[in-house]
Curated annotation (Swiss-Prot):
GO terms for biological process: translation. One of its GO terms (molecular function) is rRNA binding. It is found in: Plastid, Chloroplast. It comes from Marchantia polymorpha (Common liverwort). HAMAP family: Ribosomal_uS19. GO terms for cellular component: chloroplast; small ribosomal subunit. Belongs to the universal ribosomal protein uS19 family. Its main location: plastid. Keywords: Chloroplast, Plastid, Ribonucleoprotein, Ribosomal protein, RNA-binding, rRNA-binding. This is Small ribosomal subunit protein uS19c. Protein S19 forms a complex with S13 that binds strongly to the 16S ribosomal RNA.
């Protein structure tokens, strides 16, 4: 079930304040955040946000096509190492 429209998108307060301050100063700095659940809103376009993936912060440049998605969608938490090349036991 999707979020109710009357509630509006969730954006962490500290993240929104940082972005609004940078917009007023017209600065472009990397913003570090752990808030993967925050929704990308139009005021974030053009900023670089470093999202935590469990080990490190991955810098993500926000574009207009990302609006409405969550920050966590662009910072994968698991690394896929690939399938085993010569595993003959599993073929039986």
């Amino acid at each position: 079930m999707t979020r109710s429209i009357k509630k509006g998108p969730f954006v962490a307060d500290h993240l929104l304040k940082k972005i609004e301050n940078l917009n007023l100063k017209k600065e472009k700095k990397i913003i570090i955040t752990w808030s993967r659940a925050s929704t990308i809103v139009p005021t974030m376009i053009g900023h670089t946000i470093a999202v935590h993936n469990g080990q490190e912060h991955l810098p993500i440049y926000i574009t207009d096509r990302m609006v409405g998605h969550k920050l966590g969608e662009f910072a994968p938490t698991r690394t896929f190492r690939g399938h085993a090349k010569n595993d003959k036991k599993s073929r039986r």
